[in-house]
Amino acid sequence: MAQSLPLIPQPKVLQKQEGSFVLSAATAIRFDRQLSVETAILADKIERLTGEKTRSVAEELRIMLSSEIALDLDSSLALKPGGYEMTVAPRGVKITGKDVAGAFAGIQTLLQLLPAAAPMAEKSVSLPALKISDEPEYGWRGMHLDCGRHFYPIEELKKFIDQMAFHKLNVFHWHLTEDQGWRIEIKKYPKLTAVGAFRDSTPPYGNRNSDDGKRYGGFYTQEQIKQLVAYASARHITIVPEIELPGHAAAAIAAYPQFGNTDIPGYNPKVMTRWGVHPYVFAPKEETFRFLEDILTEVCDLFPSKFIHIGGDEAPKSQWNQSKFAKEVMQREGLKNADELQSYFIRRIEKFLASKNRSLVGWDEIQEGGLPKSATMMVWRDLKWAQHALDLGNNVVMAPNAYAYLDHYQRPVGEELSKGAEFEAIGGFLPVSKLYGYDPASVARNEKERKQILGVQGQLWTEYMKDWKKVEYMAFPRIAALAEIAWLPKDKKNYEDFRVRLDGVMKFYDALGINRAVPLDPPQKKTKDGSVIETSLNVHADHAIEFAYDGRANTFFWAGRELKKDDHITLRLKSPLTAVARVTVQTGGKASQNGDRLEKGELQYSVDGSTWIKVADFSEGKASGSIPAQSKALRVLVTAPQKFWLIVHEMTIE
């Protein structure tokens, strides 16, 4: 039942029932008065489908209507915050939230059961009877969007918020300041937008070290920001703003040069026109801290979020190391080096945010020189930094670049660039299947550390996303995989089932005109003729053992550790050979002459499946020879340990 329904995230518990419910223009919504905002959103969606006004009745759920959707609350439900129960029966749909956010999550599940295209071709739709009990695994289910490198209209951001809600994501991390542009209006410092919001040029697609010579920029007014915050809040999404400091600050320093390190040689700040990391960082002056506190005061007034993100990443120390004043601060404060100066800088900001009853979030570089005790660390680099924060008792949000950076290519780079320079990405490779396979809790060693992992977040860095269509292409459908790993516990995940459901959800994307990518499906993990293959070795990434005997030139098995004596790969044929055959096994990668090839091993065969006879020794990573009719199995046996891992391209029998 679950596999046939386009539900992403998959509900934790879904049970099929007898019968169905017919939703039509005659269906009314009966709701608890605390759910009036959520009811209005649902009613609007149904009206778009039916083409007629939806009747909504706030009668505290006392009188059941003949055809209805009932929205209720029950804090006693044995579910996590944000959980809900949903029943579809012949007389109607009932959604009961543990809290208001849970009721809204249930509404999103209902909307995914409705037709994608609006208005409906028919005047009604039949929904299968079912029972759902559902709750989120993580409280932080986030998407990040960089509006510093490129600026996007507020109406597009609202559509993005809608899609986040549809996927039950609940944190929008809004990256608002960068070396290449300052995007948030600050009343006290108007030059931040008059100067900092505009750059003189932008690298064109296909030439990262060139300029298009076109002035570029834009910013969000405080009124626009208030509107977006309210829009997101109505959809149970918290907007966490990011104001970068002490680095990625060139645009701000270009607007107000006095807050940079003015005593260094060649000081000449400007809004940057190239991507990458730039040296301009805020000076550790008292005037700078007052400047930043003034900015953050206005930010806190605009954003009710408990969390304020201060960046903290990729802050070069070269200017501090050149600055006489910065060195004097280090000496005065007893700081050993510029790393500790960054920690001092972050702690000053943390203390200020605490005075505003806000909590600091920063990228994992904020631990350099010492991690503030109450800070939440957003992990994007090596997972060892997550372990470091967990050891110290800090909370973390997992946002690893290898698994959650949606600015990476999602299909082979050659294939993408063959379609045009506008398909350029920063690099990397993150297909849907790889993102789906990520477990945010993999770094936790015990339940205490698991609770310190607040959740997971996908990142959209936009150097190579000049317009909204490109943002959509990079975000969809990978956002669906992100949503499921943020909502479901690991033991409930199943990629094959997810992939079936994704086809249904992509119909919603298409109906809305979203410029989605075509997901890259991994090769099926099966042998070419139904033979059984097994190994004593771990598997690296998605390079399954079946790929050693699948008949495809573009797949291979890759072991995930060093080899030990008596490690093996054993192929048990579907049926015995009927004639003499020649067997060849080729190992080794292309990275180097000796890369991941078998140095010491034997190729063996068996007629009875248990007695093994040597065919040949491996030499330069290859073994071949003839085996007799009636052979039932082949084996690659490691005869000596080796530090290289092992790649097996294909076991051929001819």
Segments (PLM) and residue ranges:
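Contiguous, structured surface segment used for ligand recognition
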Residues: 3-140, 470, 485-519
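Feature activates predominantly on carbohydrate-active enzymes
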Residues: 75-307, 348, 352, 452, ...
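Active-site neighborhood of glycoside hydrolase catalytic domains
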Residues: 257, 271-273, 277-373, 380-388
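Flexible, acidic glycine-rich loops studded with aromatic residues
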Residues: 359-375, 381-528
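Disordered, acidic Ser/Thr/Pro-rich linker "stalks" and the adjacent N-terminal cap
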Residues: 520-579, 586-601, 617-618, 650-654
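Exposed aromatic-hydrophobic patches
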Residues: 571, 622-628
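Short beta-strand-plus-loop segments that form exposed binding edges in beta-rich domains
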Residues: 636-644
